Amino acid sequence: MEVFFLSLLLICVLSVSIRLYLLLYKHRSHFTGPNLPPGKIGWPMVGESLEFLSTGWKGHPEKFIFDRISKYSSEVFKTSLLGEPAAVFAGAAGNKFLFSNENKLVHAWWPSSVDKVFPSSTQTSSKEEAKKMRKLLPQFLKPEALQRYTGIMDHIAQRHFADSWDNRDEVIVFPLAKRFTFWLACRLFMSIEDPAHVAKFEKPFHVLASGLITIPIDLPGTPFHRAIKASNFIRKELRAIIKQRKIDLAESKASKTQDILSHMLLATDEDGCHMNEMSIADKILGLLIGGHDTASSAITFLVKYMAELPHIYEKVYKEQMEIANSKAPGELLNWDDVQKMRYSWNVACEVMRLAPPLQGAFREAITDFVFNGFSIPKGWKLYWSANSTHKSLECFPQPEKFDPTRFEGAGPAPYTFVPFGGGPRMCPGKEYARLEILIFMHNLVKRFKWDKLLPDEKIIVDPMPMPAKGLPVRLHPHKP
């Protein structure tokens, strides 16, 4: 009997050993080939993902990049991230190469967790779904279309400050910034303006956003499991809104051009077919994520830096009050007013340089190619990092110094300032983000000055930068 159990144990150990060997062999086989970039591949499945993520959790995501640039004396290096063989392209030359070769040598890539959270994309892929969205969005997000949204956005901003900021001594900025940008997205994408209706989505939506780019382990208690549950709840609510909008369009109670939702319901593909409800719900869900998450981070860091730099605040205040004093009582901001906010936008750009809401993004090599003398195999994932240029001494003198004058005149050199990406895949919502950020700034500074309550509050990047405690501030209302 003892011999039997000993034999069984040996078989189990041998089986596990063989599996581990095969896993290690498969992992290393992804990194074989002539003249690959220098770098370390780490352990199977894990690779260097924990180091990559932990530098963000500690508030310094650029450390992962700059440490390896220094170690390998190269602006391109190999690694393994999110279970995939990868190369990191750092610097303006790497940005230019990736942005200029979209759909030629590379195309967009998202972790598998994205396809699992958005089930309609599994019929094609999240890449194909993104292409469809980029065809739908331009007419709603181009400057001509955004002009008519300016007054609406100012109206919502005024309501937001009246509800959440006025008559308060202290506030926590980050959750309020998320509430504002989410309210805007709901209003402009789906014509939902009632705060109670917006609030119904708010909590599950933040659960979804925080668990979207995580290790895709669907077990109770994991961020990914919570994200799937939240997405199912939101999708159910969205489908109810879609069904009602169909009825309203049929009965002429809704306009064909009032928002993105109406356009999606009426749009057809090359074969004349309409999108199904699930596909529309997933697209709206994706838009809500892209339409508010990054802007709320940028707004929060604007508040942070203006609290720390009173001379910057005073210049922004002067510019915004000149605009405010030119308006009649009760008159909303218009497009021309926003175009006058030049210094304010330079400040916002400097904030996004130092704390880019979009830390970077992945591409996938669709063919073998050579960059900087190194071979990049087909199928490898390629990561570009905003911080690799934003905080580079070569691209920005005194990179740690807050200096909005960097954006005067011609501004930074091409491919060095990339908070919205670049090339064909530059964020289509760039102008929309500019509007919501500037309108928030206008309504904030004309009401308050403020102080940080936690002078040394830690910054976390996961995946966007955010203050660990949400940036609590003490408000000082301006005297009438």
Swiss-Prot record:
The protein's enzyme class: oxidoreductase
One Gene Ontology MF term: heme binding
Keywords in alphabetical order: Heme, Iron, Membrane, Metal-binding, Monooxygenase, Oxidoreductase, Transmembrane, Transmembrane helix
Organism: Vitis vinifera
Gene3D superfamilies recorded: Cytochrome P450
Listed SUPFAM superfamilies: Cytochrome P450
Record's protein name: Beta-amyrin 28-monooxygenase
Reported tissue expression: Expressed in leaves, stems and fruit skin.
Compartments reported by the entry: Membrane
Positions with a binding annotation for heme: 427
Main location: membrane
Reaction catalyzed: beta-amyrin + 3 reduced [NADPH--hemoprotein reductase] + 3 O2 = oleanolate + 3 oxidized [NADPH--hemoprotein reductase] + 4 H2O + 4 H(+)
Presence of the UniProt keyword NADP in the record: no
PROSITE patterns, per the entry: CYTOCHROME_P450 (PS00086)
Alphabetized CDD domains for the sequence: CYP90-like (cd11043)
GO annotation, cellular component aspect: membrane
